[in-house]
UniProtKB/Swiss-Prot annotation:
GO cellular component: ribonucleoprotein complex; ribosome
Family: Belongs to the universal ribosomal protein uS10 family.
Organism: Phocaeicola vulgatus (strain ATCC 8482 / DSM 1447 / JCM 5826 / CCUG 4940 / NBRC 14291 / NCTC 11154)
PANTHER family (UniProt xref): 30S RIBOSOMAL PROTEIN S10 FAMILY MEMBER (PTHR11700)
Quaternary structure and interacting proteins, as annotated: Part of the 30S ribosomal subunit.
InterPro entries: Ribosomal_uS10, Ribosomal_uS10_CS, Ribosomal_uS10_dom, Ribosomal_uS10_dom_sf
Keywords: Ribonucleoprotein, Ribosomal protein
Domain of life, source organism: Bacteria
General function of this protein: Involved in the binding of tRNA to the ribosomes.
Record protein name field: Small ribosomal subunit protein uS10
Gene Ontology BP annotations: translation
Matches recorded under SMART domains: Ribosomal_S10
SUPFAM superfamilies: Ribosomal protein S10 (SSF54999)
């Protein structure tokens, strides 16, 4: 098989992303594949500005921030055992996983 697998993890909670990345790296290393990462990608911040009042007081505003955290993991010289281990892996529901082969 011996192909490169790229895994991108994305979440709004950095603890979930780090724990999931650590779990994936441990699983892949146990199967004997070579792992590069987890590589932290830039944090994407979305800032929302909202008026506090509905009618007057335009100067009074409130800001909310939504940060998304990303990690990148590359797996080299993977085998069928590596792919099976990744398929059986349980990850938290707050983490988006994107896999490219």
């Amino acid at each position: 098989m011996s192909q490169k697998i790229r895994i991108k993890l994305k979440s709004y909670d950095h603890n979930l992303v780090d724990k999931s990345a650590e779990k994936i790296v441990r699983t892949v290393k146990a199967t004997g594949a070579i792992v590069s990462g987890p590589i932290p990608l830039p944090t994407h911040k979305r800032i929302f500005t909202v008026n506090r009042s509905t009618f007057v007081n335009k100067k009074s505003r409130e800001q909310f921030e939504l940060s998304s955290y990303k990690r990148l993991i590359d797996i080299y010289s993977s085998t069928a055992k590596t792919v099976d281990a990744l398929m059986k892996l349980e990850l938290p529901s707050g983490v988006e996983v994107e896999i490219k082969v």
